[in-house]
């Protein structure tokens, strides 16, 4: 939006041309979303408290969590509003990738909002029934996949890239739709499963989102893409603005979500942010890199799958409780230790993911 204004004002003062630079608009995206999140956070927390929109805590979980009962939830709306406003202000709104990522994020956030609303406002412990949650996730995920497939200008944008193997590129054809569906929906649910401790999900999301922003910036520049032997995706660089907005909104939210949390993001935030990561990775053909960098999300998801499968097949549980962060809590780890160690793991995995840019 402001880019259009800057282009108009260039005829009066050439200095406004500086807003053409993606790097500047990415930084402004961070600062705008961060400011919005920090300024609106206290108001949102007070509003949630007044409306008694608080988290309910399971009795069979770690006893330390009982003190969290009543903590305001649905704070993900703060993240999404900050991301949305910042992106609309600083991104090129004629870029189709910006709209795809933004709409997927908001639509998955809407699913989470309905789920949270039914749990917290209507006091329905089931929330949105799983079949309906997965149905709408599938609808939105498939719509995004089909759109990206049908509008792909070249086969490069529907090819699976294998990191560190520069000559291995697998044309997916219609299989691109299937892969995209699973990446977006899988990422959405993986982040949601991880969101069980104060700050546990948001910081890895910020780190992975920032790294994907770097991939988007490089993939959108033909010279960088050719030098690094990564797919050149025209227009993908504009997603650095969305990535910046995600970083700023996430850090602003973490200010209030750090242990002991003043607010939780709820499904409205977790489902949306996971879908955003998946969509960005698909656009720049870095699904495998997302799998690496989002290793904490993968670990959390696998722990649930293993726990459920083991109990159904043998009647025994592999972990004391799933997702796995609760397993470590029940082993006696203090909550901050679990959180920070998972952050450290994410830092390492993100660095490995970024290293694949040169290891080819």
Curated annotation (Swiss-Prot):
Its main location: membrane. The gene is mraY. It comes from Pseudomonas savastanoi pv. phaseolicola (strain 1448A / Race 6) (Pseudomonas syringae pv. phaseolicola (strain 1448A / Race 6)). The chain crosses the membrane at residues 25-45, 73-93, 97-117, 135-155, 170-190, 199-219, 236-256, 263-283, 288-308, 338-358. Pathway: Cell wall biogenesis; peptidoglycan biosynthesis. Its cofactor is Mg(2+). Belongs to the glycosyltransferase 4 family. MraY subfamily. GO terms for biological process: cell division; cell wall organization; peptidoglycan biosynthetic process; regulation of cell shape. Keywords: Cell cycle, Cell division, Cell inner membrane, Cell membrane, Cell shape, Cell wall biogenesis/degradation, Magnesium, Membrane, Metal-binding, Peptidoglycan synthesis, Transferase, Transmembrane, Transmembrane helix. This is Phospho-N-acetylmuramoyl-pentapeptide-transferase. The lineage of its organism: Bacteria, Pseudomonadati, Pseudomonadota, Gammaproteobacteria, Pseudomonadales.
């Amino acid at each position: 939006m402001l880019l259009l204004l800057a282009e108009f004002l260039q005829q009066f003062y050439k200095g406004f041309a500086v807003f053409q630079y993606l790097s500047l608009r990415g930084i402004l995206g961070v600062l705008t979303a961060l400011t919005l999140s920090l300024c609106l956070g206290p108001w949102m927390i007070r509003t949630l408290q007044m409306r008694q929109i608080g988290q309910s805590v399971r009795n069979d979980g770690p006893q330390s969590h009982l003190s969290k009962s009543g903590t305001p939830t649905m704070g993900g709306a703060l993240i999404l509003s900050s991301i949305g406003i910042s992106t609309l202000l600083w991104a090129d709104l004629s870029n189709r990738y910006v709209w795809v990522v933004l709409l997927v994020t908001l639509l998955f956030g809407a699913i989470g909002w309905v789920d949270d609303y039914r749990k917290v406002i209507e006091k329905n412990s089931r929330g949105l029934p799983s079949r309906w949650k997965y149905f709408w996730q599938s609808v939105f995920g498939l719509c995004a996949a089909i759109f990206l497939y049908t509008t792909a200008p070249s086969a490069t944008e529907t090819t699976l890239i294998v990191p560190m193997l520069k000559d291995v590129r697998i044309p997916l054809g219609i299989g691109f739709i299937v892969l995209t569906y699973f990446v977006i929906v899988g990422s959405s649910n993986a982040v949601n499963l991880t969101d069980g401790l104060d700050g546990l999900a948001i910081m890895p999301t910020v780190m992975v989102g920032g790294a994907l922003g770097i991939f988007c910036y490089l993939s959108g520049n033909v010279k960088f893409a050719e030098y690094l032997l990564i797919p050149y995706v025209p227009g993908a660089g504009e997603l650095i603005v969305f990535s910046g907005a995600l970083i700023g909104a996430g850090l602003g939210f973490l200010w209030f979500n750090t242990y002991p949390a003043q607010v939780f993001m709820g499904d409205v935030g977790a489902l949306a942010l996971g879908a955003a990561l998946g969509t960005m990775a698909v656009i720049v053909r870095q699904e495998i890199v997302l799998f690496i960098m989002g290793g904490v999300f993968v670990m959390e998801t696998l722990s649930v799958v293993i726990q459920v499968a083991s109990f159904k097949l043998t009647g025994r549980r592999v972990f004391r409780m799933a997702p796995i962060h609760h397993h470590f809590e029940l082993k006696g780890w203090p909550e901050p230790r679990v959180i920070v160690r998972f952050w450290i793991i994410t830092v390492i995995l993100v660095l490995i993911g970024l290293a694949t840019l040169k290891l080819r």
